[in-house]
From Swiss-Prot:
Keywords: Membrane, Mitochondrion, Mitochondrion inner membrane, Transmembrane, Transmembrane helix
GO CC aspect terms: MICOS complex; mitochondrial crista junction
Lineage: Eukaryota, Fungi, Dikarya, Ascomycota, Saccharomycotina
Name the UniProt record assigns to this protein: MICOS complex subunit MIC12
Organism field: Zygosaccharomyces rouxii (strain ATCC 2623 / CBS 732 / NBRC 1130 / NCYC 568 / NRRL Y-229)
Recorded name of the encoding gene: AIM5
Annotated localization: Mitochondrion inner membrane
Major subcellular site: mitochondrion
Record bears the keyword Membrane: yes
GO biological process, one term: cristae formation
Role: Component of the MICOS complex, a large protein complex of the mitochondrial inner membrane that plays crucial roles in the maintenance of crista junctions, inner membrane architecture, and formation of contact sites to the outer membrane.
Bilayer disposition of the protein: Single-pass membrane protein
Length: 97
């Protein structure tokens, strides 16, 4: 009985692999394979290696830049302290409402 189960499981796995291979690579002239991201990247890399395709350098846009302001740590701590004081005062005053 165990040989029958083993044979059935091997047949099921083999059939599943064969069907997935057929539908991915063969059916509709390999539509899914030709349009896959891995294939496109592989073709682009192969073109760069062969010299038939150029690398287009990207130019950074100025609109996405973030301005960073460096502040002393004491100012940041003062801001955090003041925020906590304001929140505590609002909490106390909310009792009277």
């Amino acid at each position: 009985m165990s040989k029958l189960i083993k044979l059935t499981s091997i047949t099921a796995v083999s059939s599943t692999l064969a069907a997935s291979y057929y539908f991915y690579f063969v059916d509709r002239d390999g539509f899914h394979y030709q349009n896959s991201q891995w294939k496109k990247i592989g073709d682009k890399v192969q073109g760069i290696i062969d010299g038939s395709e150029n690398i287009n350098p990207s130019t950074p846009s100025n609109s996405n830049q973030v301005i960073v302001v460096k502040r002393p740590m004491t100012e940041t701590m003062k801001d955090l302290w003041n925020e906590q004081i304001r929140n505590t005062a609002n909490w106390f005053y909310s009792w009277g409402k």
